[in-house]
């Protein structure tokens, strides 16, 4: 890992949108362009409550996060039709997050993203907003498959 970070104009703009707004963000770029550095910097310097997720166990380890399936309690066979409102002690946690970051977004199937959206709409703070009103930050290189 680099011990210093060059904060250029694009980096500052992305950080501003992530920190100061609730807008959904898609961060892309080739390998070595600073996506992981930006993610790490934001995570360690934000005032927001952030969850960092990835589609696979290895990708989750790389960002010190959890898998999407683990975080939402999804079984491997999850479909949007099977996503339900949850109750009990775990239910409140999904209302506490301001931002959910999903790294390696190019590896996330569209139907799994539909499950995440439905889950957050049912269990997040605002049922009538996309992803339950929680800011989503998608990070990845769509040319890397």
PLM regions with names:
Residues 1-145:
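Conserved ATP-binding/catalytic motifs of P-loop helicase motor domains
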């Amino acid at each position: 890992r680099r011990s210093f970070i060059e904060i250029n104009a694009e980096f500052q703009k992305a950080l501003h949108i992530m920190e100061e707004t609730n807008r959904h963000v898609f961060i892309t770029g080739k390998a070595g362009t600073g996506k992981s550095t930006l993610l790490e910097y934001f995570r360690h310097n934000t005032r927001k409550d952030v969850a960092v997720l990835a589609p696979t166990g290895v990708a989750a380890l790389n960002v010190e996060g959890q898998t999407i399936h683990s975080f939402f309690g999804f079984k491997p066979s999850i479909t949007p039709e099977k996503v339900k409102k949850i109750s009990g002690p775990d239910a409140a946690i999904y209302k506490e997050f301001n931002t959910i970051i999903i790294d390696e977004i190019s590896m996330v199937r569209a139907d799994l993203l539909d499950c995440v959206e439905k889950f957050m709409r049912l269990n997040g703070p605002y049922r009538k907003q996309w992803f339950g009103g929680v800011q989503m930050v998608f990070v990845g290189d769509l040319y890397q498959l």
